[in-house]
Each structure stands twice: as structure tokens, then as C-alpha cells.
UniProtKB/Swiss-Prot annotation:
The keyword DNA repair applies. PROSITE patterns: DNA_MISMATCH_REPAIR_1. The gene is mutL. SUPFAM superfamilies: ATPase domain of HSP90 chaperone/DNA topoisomerase II/histidine kinase, DNA mismatch repair protein MutL, Ribosomal protein S5 domain 2-like. InterPro entries: DNA_mismatch_repair_CS, DNA_mismatch_repair_MutL, DNA_mismatch_S5_2-like, HATPase_C_sf, MutL/Mlh/PMS, MutL/Mlh/Pms-like, MutL_C, MutL_C_dimsub. This is DNA mismatch repair protein MutL. It comes from the Bacteria.
Amino acid sequence: MAIRQLSETLINQIAAGEVIERPASAAKELIENALDAGATRIEIATSGGGKALLRVSDNGSGMDAADLELAVRRHCTSKISETLEDIRTLGFRGEALPSIGSVARLSIASRRRDSAGGHEIAVAGGKIAHLRPAAANPGTIVEVRDLFFATPARLKFLKTEKAEAGAITEIVKRMAIAFPAVRFVLSGSDRTTLEFPATGDDHLGRMAQVLGKEFRDNAIALDAVREEIALTGFAGVPTFNRGNSAHQYAFVNGRPVQDKLILSAIRGAYAETIPSGRYPVAVLSITLDPALVDVNVHPAKSDVRFRDPGLVRGLIVGAIREALARDGSRAATTGASDMLRSFRPGFPPNSQRPQTAWSAETSSSRPYQPATGFGERPQASFDGLSMPTARAEPQFSPQPAAAEPNARYPLGAARAQIHANYIVAQTEDGLVIVDQHAAHERLVFEAMRKALHSKRLASQVLLIPEIVDIPEEDCDRLMQHAAELSELGLAIERFGPGAIAVRETPAMLGEVDAHGLIRQLADEIAEWDTASGLSAKLEYVAATMACHGSVRSGRRLRPEEMNALLREMEVTPGSGQCNHGRPTYIELKLSDIERLFGRS
């Protein structure tokens, strides 16, 4: 069979197969064109999930008749001329409009700002139907109908209308985050589904619009520079995490990307702070010389290739970890919100209050006795947390008492320990509930990690070695890494078949559950690649040791111990979450407490 030149229409349809995969792909290309035209207002309307109708209107620079005719031809563009090494626009190939026109019914109405009138061009199945004058406002309106009517086989690969509409919504969100100075409106068949007013330079305000106020309340600002690359954005605190990676947004020179290198760097930065199966929330913007990044490596321009990927990864990991360390003990606010939603009033409306020993109905002659802490400050008996009975006559001071010094700390002053596991502390504007085991586990881990890096991890010799019985293959694995474990202060040796003797443990752990620790370490080492050694996993091993050497649930603490724990949390990086990524404390504001009692 002889080789022959393909028709222009078929060439465009082939290109459309790569560039226009679904309605969301068309929406992305049209929004990019609007942004490149300098638009400050972009409206997107859809019907049938974008398959029946996709309309993008903008107030950009507009086009005249000559521009319109060229715009629907392949590789005609105003954005580049001779080189791909200085791309400063979102689009640059000149493929989007001809590709869309080859598989759909396309019409474009446009008018330049300095022109008295506009023009309209229509393309169907790759053929220009007409080009004529038309009434139009300054800017451009692109209307795509019956997407893939010319290639019906493609329709079989599309998802439901709801799924396709959801994909368009996600595209609009990403563009809105990248361009806060632009107003975006997305409407469906019968209603406006999204509206993001312009926020100017207020990037966090735009993120609150798109990602919700919870992200704004739990975000840490990023601002770092390494050589010629700048990183800005916001990263959520580790305890503010999600069940998938859909809430990770990355932008390179303003271009939304889903680059594997960037997403991998985000995971690496949070590796020790969130549990397996959970994903951080982050918005990263990387700015660099266009010559240092290749954006022409993917048909949809969703991937990029950096000239120095190691530098970019190091910048991301370092910036996020530094920000998390800077905010130290901060935890997500969502825990308190969840707690508030779970609260119910003590007595439902219109219900009869149960008769109790303290109710007015059964104790009308009984003198009023205030609850402990109202009439008289209690003297806590730590072991049982028993409180003396308050005096019958409440003693109220006409002037509010000065706040105790401890209450002025971020995590407040310890007031009680409940269920031998949770510390209740009073702050200046609310209260904090701390999980003592999770908090101490994080503190121990950070201390071990610091000592490990400084090569000053001391060990304590056990008076009587602990003998742990485990399977022979686990013994072999542990002994293979005995030298590396000794760096963490854990000295082990063989004690006959199927047994390990623990001679020394890290001094900072105090009393250690050696049996549980050895068994868990054996399981973890079996799960890892034993041939690679533990050098890259020492911090994970330290986290395991910290868990087994922390204050256990059920241990009663003295008030001074509780306050000491709170003070140490305030100065320890990452103390807002334990080594497994769970929160170590929940804060409840006074305004939230008042709302529970209907005071607000």
C-alpha cells in the first residue's frame, strides 16, 4: 500500500485523541486560552457533563476576523515563535481549537477591546462553516456542542454525566487556585455550581474559597528559595489529612501540573507524620526560569521535566519539614469541630428532666452546694483525683481572678487527668484535651531522633537481661541488624534457639516493654528489605521504640508531671501529632463551649 498524506481533518482528529480526552480536557484548554488573553473574569457553562454543551466566556483581549481564521488551524499561535525554551504562557502548541473543531461543533465569537464590532466563526467536523461579523462584547465566547459527534467511538469511553461534570469542576478549582486575581463562575444546566470572586493577591483567601475554611485554619505558609527556584504555598498540618491525594495541588510557573516528582516530594516531607493510607493537603507553587523546566513532555501538559529534579525535590521536602517544625505543637482544628458535632444537649427539648439527687424536685430543701471549683478552688489529690467537698456558701469574687501563669501558655495549665489517659488543661480562651501516651510518644521520638543524629544516644544496662522467645527466622533477622540497633541504644544477643536476650535499652525510654518491642521490630524488619540494611529505616525503628517506651495509657500523672508534659510539647517540633499521624491534643475554644450551652 502506497504512503499518502493524511487529510487535515484526520490529522486534527488524531491530535484530538491526545489533547482532548474528555470534556474536562476541552475545558482546560479553553480556560488556559482565556487566561493567556489576560482575562479577569471567566465563566464556564456546561450541559450533559460538557458533552452536549461547553461554553467558556471571558473578558480578555479578544480576536479580529483574521485571528479567528488562524485560530482554528493547527499550529497557529501568538504565544511562541522560534523556541520552546522560554514558554511563559499556559498554551503554546496551537492545537486545542483545531482539535476540538475536528470532533465537535465549535463556534467562537470574539471582539477586540479597541474594535467597534466583533466576528464569529463556526467549525463542524473540521470544516469552517462560516466567518461573519457578529455582535459581541469585548472578549471571547467559545461554544463547544456535541463533543465527539464526529468520532462516536470516543463517546463509549466517557463516564457518566456526573463524573464528567465533576472532572470539569476539578479543572476549574485548580485554575482558580493558580489565579486568585481572576473571577471564576461555573454553572450547570440549571444552576451555578461554583463561584469564586477575585481575591487579588490574597492567595489564602482564594484557597479558603476553593478548599474550605478548614484548610485556611490548618494551613502553614511556605516560602523558600534554593538557587534559582522559589517555592511558595501552603501545607496542611499533618493531622489535617485526607483519604486520597486529590487535595494536593502543584503549580509550575502558574501552570497546574500533576507531576510525579512533586507529589512524591510531598509524601516524603510528611513520611514520619501521617499514618499509612492517609494523604496530606498541600498547595505548592514553584517559580523558576522557563529554561530550567520542559513543559512539552505530555500531550495534556500535566507533567513537566525539571533540569535539576534533585534540587526541586530537596527544596519541597526541606521547606515543608521546616514549616512543620516551625509550627511545632500545632494540631488540626477539625478534631474540635468533629467533637462539637457529636455533642447533644443533656436533655432534649420538651422532655422531662430525670429526677436526680441534685434536682430541685427531689431536693428542694437541700441547700445549694456549688460544684467543685466554683465556690472554692480544689486541692487535687493526684492518685485518685479526689476533690474535697465545696463549702455550702459559694465564694464569688467581685473581681475576676488573675489567670494563672500556666494558663497563659499555648497548651494551658493542667486541671485534671481523666480515665488515666487524658489530660484536661485550661487555656486563656478555652480548654485542651491531651492524649498523654500519644503526646509522650512524639516527645520521646523527637528526642531519640535528635540524639541519633548527634551520635549521643545513651543506653542503660539491664540488671537482669530480658529474654524474648520468637521464631528462629526472626532471631536471624534481628541479629543480622544487631550493630545498627545498637546505634539506637538497643543491645541484643542470641540466647539459644528461638530466643533473644535484651542486654541494653535506650536510656531515655526508662522502663521498656522489651517483649513487645522485640516482636514488633522483628515484624517490621521482615516487612522491609533486609538486604538494604536498617540505615535508611533507623528513624522508623526509633518511632517503634518511642511507642513502647512512652507513658502508657492508664498511668496516673501528678499535676507537675502533666504541666511538664504540656510545656515540652510546646517547644517540640511536630508534637501536634503522634508518630502514627494521630492528633495528640484537641483544643476547644470558650466560644465553642458557650455554643454548646446555647450562650452564643
